[in-house]
Amino acid sequence: MSRIGKQPIPVPEKVAVELDGLSLTVKGPKGELSRTLPEGVSISQVDNSIVVSAINSKRKSRERHGLSRSLVANMVEGVSKGYSKKLEIVGVGSRAQVKGKNLIVSAGYSHPVEVIPPDGITFVVENNTNVTVSGIDKELVGNEAAKIRAIRPPEPYKGKGIKYAGERIIRKAGKSGKK
């Protein structure tokens, strides 16, 4: 039995949960998320909590037990609190701005790069170098932040590029000149 999977998921008062077999819909103050859980698990609602359990003790079922519990917990937290990832743009002339809903990043290329957000994702830019990606779906927020970082990943010599807030870039020494 999964140590993560056997923990019940507390459901806040503001969050409504609808179960239909392996389909789950979670509604909260920030929005609504739906997901179909993988085969091999069962889900039930007990009082103000959700319990995910493995149907049998086969390997596939045990593997998906903890995964399913984490997915449901992320959905409940997403519709009640939301998720956000912060990115920092480092480098001379590198900056970002929001135009409508789209994010426009100038990262040292000959042209600005435009990032179009999927539904449920918002971009906020503070003082041209700090970008916050926020939404209710943890997976979607992480993927969008990774796409923005991939525009210009931080390089190890000067540390220029787009990095996550708090990310430590391991620096390399440059060439040691001829002596």
Curated annotation (Swiss-Prot):
SUPFAM superfamilies: Ribosomal protein L6. The keyword Lipid metabolism does not apply. One of its GO terms (molecular function) is rRNA binding. Gene3D superfamilies: Ribosomal protein L6, alpha-beta domain. It holds the Pfam family Ribosomal_L6. The keyword rRNA-binding applies. Coiled coil: none annotated. GO terms for cellular component: cytosolic large ribosomal subunit. Keywords: Ribonucleoprotein, Ribosomal protein, RNA-binding, rRNA-binding. GO terms for biological process: cytoplasmic translation. Part of the 50S ribosomal subunit. This protein binds to the 23S rRNA, and is important in its secondary structure. It is located near the subunit interface in the base of the L7/L12 stalk, and near the tRNA binding site of the peptidyltransferase center. Belongs to the universal ribosomal protein uL6 family. HAMAP family: Ribosomal_uL6_B. This is Large ribosomal subunit protein uL6.
